[in-house]
Amino acid sequence: MLQDYPKEALLKDGFSCTLRPMISDDLEGLYRFFVSLPEKDLRYLRDDPTDRRLVEKWCREINYDKVLPILAEHEGGIIANATLHRQTSGWGKHVGEIRVTIATEVRQRGLGFRMVEELSSLARAAGLNKLCARAIASQTDAITVFEKNGYSLVATLKNFVKDVHQDEYQDIAILVKDLTQE
């Protein structure tokens, strides 16, 4: 499954980047990527990746069977992080969850679409049947990326997530893709 990496991704306007799995040596680059994100992007992430200890833990405890992180690099820097989260046993072992974070300066070039497409392909190869993604309901560009990748909006949970900086609640959109229908 990972033998095809690294691979080049050609995006809109000829922009090119390299996709590959994260390795433990990515600590510095991954941390730089996360701290470069604007505060408005960071406030709705599930974890606080500006906490260096957290990123150190991610890089130290890599287990591709549970969390498969795919990075996009351009000119030596990380410009996107996408992760496929899986349960290895129990009632949810056929379902994966994906999370995608894209650097502001490379948005609107198709990188988000490409990262979602890449994780969907990896999930299918791993034998998963369904994928789930969550996005703040007001993040319409992100929701559109998922929908263009075959995800359906199945629910919107009202006032479900809280912006930890401004103490405001937001709605969250739940999107699902059925991999058995492709």
Please tell me what each predicted stretch does.
Residues 40-47:
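A short gly/proline-enriched turn/hairpin at secondary-structure junctions
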Residues 15-17, 75-81, 170:
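Glycine-rich phosphate/pyrophosphate-binding loop shared by adenosine-nucleotide-utilizing enzymes
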Residues 116, 123-135:
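Conserved GNAT acetyl-CoA-binding A-motif
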Residues 106, 110:
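Glycine-rich phosphate-binding loop
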Residues 16-29:
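A short beta-loop-alpha structural element at the N-terminal edge
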Residues 1-13:
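Short acidic N-proximal helix/loop "leader" segments that mark the beginning
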Residues 47-105, 116, 178-180:
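Acetyl-CoA-dependent GNAT
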Residues 132-135, 143, 147-168:
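Conserved catalytic-core motifs of GNAT/GCN5-like acyltransferases
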